[in-house]
């Protein structure tokens, strides 16, 4: 940075070329130098003559003339007298706009504290003087004395307690001390003067050194904190004239006494206007009233002092003056707010700048613009993609100046006046000129709410009659517009540059892709989809079936001649190939570009297929082809939707015949369950869950039957079915409400009402059903209103935190990346690997797991083709560069960001990626919330999980798994954690019998098998091996990773598999709960039908070591008996196309070397008919089982006290149920006394049902008790939006889980004050101790091994803990998967990179742990950039750098902590931000978007970066 010079802002012109902006405290001299005179009188204007009073608040002499170039008395009245001061009235003759910039001042008789520096925490004045804020207020408001000079004064007679400097005394103490010590120099005063003097006499440098010594010498943390607080304020004052550590010559640092006001500046009068209303009344700005009070009190005080009034009166007046100034600056901050005539608080200067209606947000960030208008929109189906219909009336107004010029230029009018008259009379020449003006001049359309960049797009206007704007149907999705009365605003770009940007960047035909996901946004919807779908349907036995047509012309002729039905199946020739298709599909083909393959159009075209088609055309053909294609598609869709004549009739809604039967069956089941409950066989929770499950499955069966019926009706041409099936409108769920049953409904709190609505809308609902329905529907509407506000607020916070992220460089040179894999939740894939790596840059080479060759090297940009190759090659995790690991000094670099999804190319420097990310996340947030009630409040939850099923083939491996066998001989899981069941295939087999050895090198792991005279070594990459914490399910994914089943030194047999690839994994307890029943044994083969997946020749191989040996003796019908059989499908060049592992017990379906011509053929069949279930468990309860055999002892379990008895009437069996609410200190438990005195204790939850009696003998794995799982609640985005908000705000969740910080073995120590004490012992001898509240459920057992990051108790994991314990990359994985789960659950696609940008901003500050020789203070939060710069500076001088740890800030905190003052102030907590900035003399280098918008400059992104280079645009005529 060059040396800055402060620029004085003069009224004649504001400086255009300033580089930075600094906020400072103004000294009294400075305030006086701004002022044009002192305001002495509280008068405003003379109410008779309406002229401002002299020396009053609107005085023309001080502030300038009221009318341009006219003095007040009217002596000088023309431009020629400019600059003359009138002798009579003293007014300078100049323009009246100086009244917006000239300030006055009021000389206060006594210094007054500025309320911001007293009352805004931490109180700056109080902190500097070391006085509490309350005490300081007492001094300032004349209630207490402050010691100026303690002399030798003591509080007590024994002289033990000395009076210190700046002590605060009450009246009594003061009088007492004055009596005794006045002679020894004791002095104390009260009020503003003494505070000002104290501040003026502070020696800041000495204070700074003193405080630094104090810090070094104190050990108390609390004291340190207070000293550090003071130190910060002192440092801020001392450094307030530094800029990046270089002095600014002409500037003195801020002085503490400037926080006291002696000269009060008066705001220029036009900024606090007084407007005459009709009827002789005046609207006056509140600030004027507040100033009047200050002036009144000040003059009164002056008079009283001249009269030598009694001290007490003067004091009172001074206090009132202080209060008046307080009210002016921040009304209501201290005592009660000053109220105006109409009983509402007056708006002070602080209120004027803060809040939504304040100066920042209302006038600086959002301005009204001219050349704009708004009107209702209607559909314009005849428009081209880049056109909009503009009403002639609007165009006439919008283009008026252009039109006037054009009329003169053509010679129709000679003067402007004449031209205006022509326009008013709307003569023919006017319309002719208007057409010419509008041609080639784009306009911008905007629909509020503007949620993302596609809410403002440019169009070429087409003049239309009428008053409504016409909009192209395909851009509605981007604007989220419909035609039920929506309005849109039109803006006219004026400058050549703006017009060029509209044409090149903003034209709607250029914005085909959605920046959030890279999918196309201009996809046909509703009618258009219906038309295209109808066109592509096929009908058996239609007229003209099996005709042969050479091309589209013949088809059209046949259709015209009515000799061919549009749905008839015909044969035709396309690209020289004979194909079977339908007439309608050939019509679709006729509008497609030539490069579209047959499989994209020769099928039934539903909405998804059309979207894929549009995407494909854009990717292959580019913008121009897409735009014209989309227009043809639109026309075709509308034409055939009309010709199809699809309508809805009640007869289309078909109710299944067997509905009543199904319902009666369900009612019967419900009655049975109700009876079991009455008999006490099941708990109330189980009853509720089971009933809901019954109704859910009944509903599903009915819906399925109904869909089948409607599908068969009219051979698939049922109108309602077509609408839903094509994706035009409606869904299966909605049709089933019309025709099957309305189903289960939810209460407003989300719980499901157990009586479903059995009727459907066709039959009609009865009164009760109708009432239950309204319940859900109203909740939907109420929610919508509330949530829109929340979503909008979230968007605003995201924008504010990310607005300064832009692409600054091409490559930051970072080599580290983040390893990513597919995101799954409970075994459901939420986001595939392919989607996640698309458009990203690799951070490490990708190695083909089969051939060990490098597929793609580091630095490759992954496009769709490469992403497909990577996923097909079986790679399960990829390391990519992300904004979080980007090393760019500011912003991000192109390589770490990847593709700009809006255009599908690598992002260019200057792109405002932060704003785009914030919009991409915020926009669907609003969308989601606006759409809760579409399912009409019907409940949607998944059926309870009861089992896990293998989806792939291989064999079973138990990892760390222990099991029990129960009395029925079932295998029961005995682990609570740190165990898993893996499904694997062999990767390396032992070539001979020997001992296995495993050595860990830096990046490799060497596995060797040693026999007497033989040794085989295999080298694996460490990165490919599954880590222990991944196997235990703590972090990351294990599929595709390698697993070594043996430990070092174990003997293995020949051909035993020693390294395996994990195909699927189910960890305990996340995927398989404790006490589940296992249905497989260790080593069991799992077979599935194996599908070829490619055409080619089959070759069978056997794994030997790590290579494949050819085996030729396998033939059709053989059963595989050995581990390690692989089949390879070789293409015509004898290259491997596909490879599959064939597990034991599979049946081979082809001979060796046979040719497979169908990629869907089954090569090997599963030996089992049904699917393979790995484990099963009780879906409704958590089971407690006996771990040892022994005798039962009850503890704190008493019937009628902590438990209740339930009696089964049929069997007379009694069982105890623990009460829901227990007395304090009562902790029911079951103890088992085993052999050898071993005791095991089971803590019981409320509502647990006990299955054993006190004193019973039990066997291992017997069931002791069951706790019902919580009653199911309906899923709704309500959980979604607050969840997203909670994650972005990094809030600590209410019930945070306690998390292990180290790997180790759990030990329970003796409890401490009703808290459980858990100690984790690590292998290296270190340990960590946790005290856990009794209210939390502990999830670990004594002696268990636990990994860092695992939960010790129940609850939600806090993202702060993830960052602290597992680091930034784990946080990246956690936040992205949590946020994506919410959005994908709603079917919203957002690219990961947008979330990453926000997360990187949440991590942009670090916390200083050790300050070294830097200027930082321990515990400071500083931005990474400042931290880096300061450390570089210190290292240059050979000093000790500071050490810091990453912290996660919520988006609000991160936005307020922005390095830019203006940006932070305009976000939230305006007064606080400005207070801090003014004391520290903070600089704002105007690097980012928001501050430049506020100052009205070009914003430094995109085309704004080139503004310095003065590019001029030439117009070609």
UniProtKB/Swiss-Prot annotation:
Which Pfam families does the UniProt record give?
RNA_pol_Rpb1_1, RNA_pol_Rpb1_2, RNA_pol_Rpb1_3, RNA_pol_Rpb1_4, RNA_pol_Rpb1_5
Is Transferase given among the entry's keywords? yes
- GO cellular-component terms in the record? DNA-directed RNA polymerase complex
Q: Which SUPFAM superfamilies match?
A: beta and beta-prime subunits of DNA dependent RNA-polymerase (SSF64484)
Chain residues that bind Mg(2+): 482, 484, 486
**Keyword set includes Nucleotidyltransferase:** yes
A single BP term in Gene Ontology: DNA-templated transcription
Tell me which cofactor or cofactors this protein depends on: Mg(2+); Zn(2+)
Q: Which UniProt keywords apply?
A: DNA-directed RNA polymerase, Magnesium, Metal-binding, Nucleotidyltransferase, Transcription, Transferase, Zinc
Q: What is its EC number?
A: 2.7.7.6
Where do the annotations place Zn(2+) 1 binding? 71, 73, 86, 89
Catalytic activity from the UniProt record: RNA(n) + a ribonucleoside 5'-triphosphate = RNA(n+1) + diphosphate
SMART domains per the UniProt record, alphabetical = RPOLA_N
Q: Which residues cross the membrane?
A: none
Which positions does UniProt annotate for Zn(2+) 2 binding? 812, 886, 893, 896
Molecular functions (GO terms): DNA binding; DNA-directed RNA polymerase activity; magnesium ion binding; zinc ion binding
How many cofactors are bound and how? Binds 1 Mg(2+) ion per subunit.
Q: Which NCBIfam families match?
A: rpoC_TIGR
Q: According to its UniProt entry, what is the function of this protein?
A: DNA-dependent RNA polymerase catalyzes the transcription of DNA into RNA using the four ribonucleoside triphosphates as substrates.
For this chain, the family text in UniProt reads: Belongs to the RNA polymerase beta' chain family.
The annotated subunit structure for this chain is: The RNAP catalytic core consists of 2 alpha, 1 beta, 1 beta' and 1 omega subunit. When a sigma factor is associated with the core the holoenzyme is formed, which can initiate transcription.
Could you identify this protein by its name? DNA-directed RNA polymerase subunit beta'
Q: Please name the source species.
A: Campylobacter lari (strain RM2100 / D67 / ATCC BAA-1060)
């Amino acid at each position: 940075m060059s040396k800055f010079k402060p620029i004085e802002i003069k009224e004649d012109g504001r400086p255009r070329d300033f580089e930075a902006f600094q906020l400072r405290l103004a000294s009294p001299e400075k305030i006086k130098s701004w002022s044009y005179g002192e305001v002495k009188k509280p008068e405003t204007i003379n109410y008779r003559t309406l002229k401002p009073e002299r020396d009053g608040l609107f005085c023309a002499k001080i502030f300038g003339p009221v009318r341009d170039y006219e003095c007040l008395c009217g002596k000088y009245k023309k431009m020629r007298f400019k600059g003359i001061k009138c002798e009579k009235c003293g007014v300078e003759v100049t323009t009246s706009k100086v009244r917006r910039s000239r300030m006055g001042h009021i000389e206060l008789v006594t210094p007054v504290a500025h309320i911001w520096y007293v009352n805004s925490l931490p109180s700056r004045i109080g902190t500097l003087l070391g006085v509490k804020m309350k005490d300081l207020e007492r001094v300032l408001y004349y209630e207490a004395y402050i010691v100026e000079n303690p002399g030798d004064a003591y509080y007590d007679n024994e002289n033990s307690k000395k009076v210190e400097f700046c002590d605060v005394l009450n009246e009594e103490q003061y009088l007492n001390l004055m009596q005794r010590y006045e002679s020894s120099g004791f002095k104390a005063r009260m009020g503003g003067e003494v505070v000002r003097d104290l501040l003026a006499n502070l020696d800041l440098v000495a204070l700074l050194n003193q405080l630094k010594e104090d810090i070094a010498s104190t050990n108390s943390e609390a004291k340190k904190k207070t000293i550090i607080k003071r130190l910060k304020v002192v440092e801020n004052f001392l450094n307030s004239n530094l800029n990046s550590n270089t002095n600014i010559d002409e500037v003195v640092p801020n002085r503490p006494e400037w926080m006291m006001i002696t000269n009060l500046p008066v705001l220029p009068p036009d900024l606090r206007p007084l407007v005459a209303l009709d009827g002789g009344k005046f609207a006056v700005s509140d600030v004027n009233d507040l100033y009047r009070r200050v002036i009144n009190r000040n003059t009164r005080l002056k008079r009283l002092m001249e009269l030598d009034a009694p001290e007490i009166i003067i004091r009172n007046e001074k206090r009132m003056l202080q209060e008046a100034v307080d009210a002016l600056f921040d009304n209501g901050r201290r005592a009660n707010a000053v109220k105006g005539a109409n009983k509402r608080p007056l708006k002070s200067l602080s209120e004027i700048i803060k809040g939504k209606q304040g100066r920042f947000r209302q006038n600086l960030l959002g301005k009204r613009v001219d050349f704009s208008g708004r009107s209702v929109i209607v559909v314009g189906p005849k428009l081209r993609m880049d056109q909009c219909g503009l009403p002639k009336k609007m165009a006439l107004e919008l283009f008026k100046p252009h039109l006037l010029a054009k009329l003169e230029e053509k010679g129709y009018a000679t003067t402007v006046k004449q031209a205006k008259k022509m326009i008013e009379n709307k003569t023919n020449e006017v319309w002719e000129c208007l057409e010419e003006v509008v041609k080639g001049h784009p306009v911008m359309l905007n629909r509020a709410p503007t949620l993302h960049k596609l809410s403002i797009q440019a169009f070429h206007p087409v003049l239309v009659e009428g008053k409504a704007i016409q909009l192209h149907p395909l851009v509605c999705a981007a604007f989220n517009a419909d035609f039920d009365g929506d309005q849109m605003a039109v803006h006219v770009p004026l400058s050549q540059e703006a017009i060029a940007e509209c044409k090149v960047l903003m034209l709607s035909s250029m914005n085909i892709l959605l920046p959030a996901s890279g999918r196309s946004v201009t996809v046909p919807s509703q009618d258009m989809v219906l038309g295209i779908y109808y066109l592509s349907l096929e009908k058996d036995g239609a007229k003209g079936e099996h005709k042969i047509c050479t091309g589209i012309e013949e088809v059209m002729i046949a259709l015209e001649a009515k000799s061919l039905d549009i749905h008839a199946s015909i044969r035709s020739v396309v690209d020289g190939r004979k194909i079977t298709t339908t007439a309608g599909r050939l019509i679709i083909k006729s509008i497609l570009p030539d490069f579209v393959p047959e499989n994209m159009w020769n099928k039934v075209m539903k909405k998804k297929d059309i979207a894929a088609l549009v995407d494909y055309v854009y990717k292959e053909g580019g913008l121009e082809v897409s735009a014209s294609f989309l227009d043809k598609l639109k026309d075709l869709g509308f034409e055939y939707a009309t010709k199809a004549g699809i309508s809805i009739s009640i007869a289309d809604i078909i109710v299944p015949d067997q509905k009543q039967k199904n319902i009666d069956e369900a009612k019967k089941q419900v009655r049975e369950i109700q009876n079991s409950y009455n008999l006490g066989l099941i708990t109330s929770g189980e009853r509720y869950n089971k009933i809901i499950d019954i109704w859910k499955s009944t509903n599903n069966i009915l819906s399925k039957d109904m869909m089948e019926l409607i599908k068969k009706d009219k051979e698939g041409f049922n109108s309602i079915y077509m609408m839903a099936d094509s994706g035009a409108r409606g869904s299966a769920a909605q049709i089933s409400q019309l025709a099957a049953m309305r189903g289960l409904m939810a209460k407003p709190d989300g719980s499901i009402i157990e009586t479903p609505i059995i009727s459907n809308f066709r039959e009609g609902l009865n009164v009760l059903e109708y009432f239950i329905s309204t319940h859900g529907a109203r909740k939907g509407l109420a929610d919508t209103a509330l949530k829109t506000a929340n979503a909008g607020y979230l968007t605003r916070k995201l924008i504010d935190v990310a607005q300064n992220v832009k692409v600054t460089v091409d490559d930051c040179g970072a080599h580290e990346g983040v390893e990513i894999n597919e995101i799954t939740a409970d075994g459901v894939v939420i986001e595939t690997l392919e989607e996640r790596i698309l458009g990203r840059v690799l951070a490490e080479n990708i190695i083909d797991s089969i051939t060990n060759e490098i597929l793609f090297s580091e630095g490759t940009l992954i496009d769709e083709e490469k992403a497909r190759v990577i996923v097909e090659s079986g790679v399960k995790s990829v390391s990519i560069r992300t904004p979080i690991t980007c090393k760019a000094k500011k912003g991000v670099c192109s390589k770490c960001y990847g593709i700009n999804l809006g255009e599908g190319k690598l992002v260019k420097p200057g792109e405002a990626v932060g704003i785009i990310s914030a919009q991409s996340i915020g926009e669907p947030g609003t969308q989601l919330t606006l759409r809760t009630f579409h399912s009409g409040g019907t409940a949607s939850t998944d059926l309870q999980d009861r089992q896990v099923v293998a989806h792939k083939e291989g064999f079973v491996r138990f990892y760390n798994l222990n099991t029990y066998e129960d009395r029925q001989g079932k295998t029961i899981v005995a682990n609570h954690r740190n165990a898993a069941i893996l499904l694997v295939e062999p990767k390396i087999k032992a070539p001979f019998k020997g001992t296995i050895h495993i050595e860990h090198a830096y990046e490799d792991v060497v596995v060797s098998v040693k026999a007497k005279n033989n040794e085989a070594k295999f080298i694996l990459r460490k990165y490919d091996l599954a880590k222990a914490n991944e196997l235990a399910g703590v972090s990351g994914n294990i599929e595709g990773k390698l697993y070594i089943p043996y430990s070092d030194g174990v003997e293995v047999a020949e051909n035993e598999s020693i390294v395996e690839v994990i195909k699927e994994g189910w960890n305990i307890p996340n995927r398989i709960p404790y006490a589940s029943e296992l249905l497989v044994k260790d080593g069991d083969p799992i077979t599935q039908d194996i599908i070829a997946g490619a055409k080619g020749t089959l070759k069978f191989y056997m794994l030997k070591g790590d290579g494949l040996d050819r085996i030729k003796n396998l033939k059709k019908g053989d059963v595989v008996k050995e581990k390690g059989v692989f089949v390879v499908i070789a293409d015509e060049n004898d290259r491997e196309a596909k490879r599959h592992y064939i597990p034991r017990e599979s049946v081979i379906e082809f001979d060796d070397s046979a040719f497979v011509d169908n990629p869907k053929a089954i090569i090997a069949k599963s030996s089992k008919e049904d699917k393979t279930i790995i484990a099963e468990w009780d879906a409704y309860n958590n089971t407690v089982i006996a771990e040892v055999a022994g005798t039962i002892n009850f503890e704190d379990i008493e019937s009628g006290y902590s438990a209740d008895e339930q009696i089964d009437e049929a069997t007379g069996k009694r069982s105890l149920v623990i009460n829901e609410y227990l007395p304090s200190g009562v902790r029911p438990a079951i103890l088992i006394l085993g052999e050898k005195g071993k005791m095991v204790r089971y803590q019981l939850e409320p509502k647990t049902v006990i299955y054993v009696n006190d004193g019973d003998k039990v066997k291992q794995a017997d069931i002791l008790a069951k706790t019902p799982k919580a009653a199911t609640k309906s899923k709704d985005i309500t959980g979604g939006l607050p969840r997203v908000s909670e994650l972005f705000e990094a809030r600590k969740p209410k019930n945070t889980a306690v998390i292990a910080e180290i790997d180790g073995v759990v030990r329970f120590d003796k409890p401490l004050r009703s808290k459980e004490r858990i100690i984790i012992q690590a292998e290296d001898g270190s340990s960590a101790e946790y005290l856990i509240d009794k209210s939390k459920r502990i999830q670990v057992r004594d002696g268990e091994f636990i990994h860092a990051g695992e939960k010790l108790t129940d609850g939600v994991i806090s993202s702060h803990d993830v960052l602290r314990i597992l680091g930034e990359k784990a946080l990246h994985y956690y936040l992205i998967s949590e946020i994506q789960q919410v959005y994908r659950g709603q079917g919203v696609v957002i690219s990961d990179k947008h979330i990453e940008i926000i997360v990187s901003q949440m991590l942009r500050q670090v916390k200083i742990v050790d300050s070294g020789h830097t200027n930082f203070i321990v515990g400071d939060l500083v931005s990474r950039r400042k931290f880096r710069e300061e450390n570089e500076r210190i290292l240059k001088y050979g000093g000790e750098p500071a050490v810091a740890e990453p912290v996660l800030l919520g988006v609000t905190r991160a936005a307020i902590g922005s390095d830019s003052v203006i940006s932070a102030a305009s976000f939230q907590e305006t007064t606080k931000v400005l207070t801090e900035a003014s004391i520290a003399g903070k600089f704002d280098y105007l690097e980012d978007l928001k501050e430049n918008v506020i100052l009205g400059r070009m914003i430094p992104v995109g085309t704004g970066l080139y503004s310095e280079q003065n590019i001029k645009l030439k117009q070609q005529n």
